[in-house]
A protein has these predicted regions:
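Acidic/aromatic/glycine-rich contiguous surface patches that form carbohydrate-binding/processing clefts
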Residues: 216
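Extended intrinsically disordered or low-complexity regions, especially N/C-terminal cytosolic tails and loops
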Residues: 1-208, 220-306
Length: 306
């Protein structure tokens, strides 16, 4: 079937929402939001307020009685707050993982240890990784990069503690995963994770969340592509589900990832108020909106949110 829906101007977009039963108390607010946020982006949030579709349909395009544009904007803003808090937590976790890996590797193998391919798995493509670092260095105007170039003739690349300031979370995860077991296990335990394998899965999941958040994507009411690894000591805190062929696994709904972030943040930044701030944002949502994130009944009583 060929797509044939015509574009609508903003006043017509608002009228279409009214025709479908959405209450609009302030035309100015609604028109401004449609102009600055966009009809399509907001539609992911007002879908929650629509009547269930009839059999054979994907959407009803009719709003539940009492649903308002203001409720849609409130939900949109809650998701934005969650996204900002997620970026905050991942920043802390990424920096802690980076610092732990740098300290472990440099103390054991020296400041330029990452240049030695023998310290990493044979399937890591070490040479390709170094080429990517060289390319980043050539394009960088960071003060520490310029200083190293102007001051030292060799090695060509800066020490590990400088190099890691240039790499992404995804690249950091790859380097840690390629490290020998004893060292990466110590990194995992510094973040409160039981094993290097679990840490790798956690960093993979958090990297996906970081990318969604950095591109301003919706987190609320979304299934995260990468399922969290099973972490035995957290099973009473996570929401679990039966997965065909895999047994009981953590749900892919957002709540589980927020639980994990709260636990790691408590480990790497004990004085942080992040868990309680996230708990406040979630508690200000209605029960159905919390359920759409995967929040279990009674989640507020969990000590991690206090």
């Amino acid at each position: 079937m060929r797509y044939s829906k015509p574009p609508l101007n903003i006043p017509d977009q608002l009228q279409q929402l009214r025709d479908r039963g959405l209450l609009v108390r302030s035309d100015d607010l609604a028109l401004n939001a449609l102009e600055l946020i966009g009809y399509y982006r907001l539609s992911a949030y007002w879908l929650f307020f629509e009547e269930p579709p009839a059999p054979g349909e994907t959407r009803s395009h009719r709003f539940k009685p009492g649903s308002s544009f203001e409720q849609v904007i409130e939900l949109y803003n809650r998701d934005r707050l969650i996204r900002l808090l997620v970026i905050d937590a991942i920043e802390r976790i990424e920096i802690a993982a980076r610092s732990a890996w740098v300290q472990e590797m440099s103390m054991k193998h020296g400041p330029h240890c990452y240049l030695d391919p023998l310290l990493f798995r044979s399937d890591f493509n070490h040479g390709e990784q170094l080429e990517q670092l060289r390319s980043q260095l050539q394009q960088s105007n960071e003060t520490f990069v310029i200083h190293y170039r102007q001051t030292y003739s060799e090695p060509e690349l800066p020490p590990i503690w400088a190099m890691t300031e240039l790499i992404s979370l995804g690249t950091l995860r790859a380097w840690i995963a390629a490290t020998e077991l004893d060292s990466k296990t110590k990194v995992a335990r510094s973040l409160g994770m039981p094993s290097a394998q679990v840490l790798n899965g956690v960093l993979h999941s958090l990297n996906l969340l970081r990318n969604i958040s950095a591109h301003h994507g919706r987190l609320w009411n979304r299934l995260i592509v990468k399922r969290l690894p099973k972490i035995k000591k957290l099973q009473n805190l996570l929401v679990l589900e039966d997965v065909d062929g895999e047994g009981v696994q953590p749900s892919k709904m957002l709540y589980n990832y927020l639980v994990l972030m709260a636990i790691i943040v408590r480990k790497v930044a004990p004085l942080s108020t992040w868990p309680s701030r996230m708990g406040v944002v979630m508690s200000e949502m209605g029960p159905e909106q919390q359920g759409a994130m995967g929040c279990p009944v009674g989640w507020q009583q969990q000590q991690i949110w206090s």
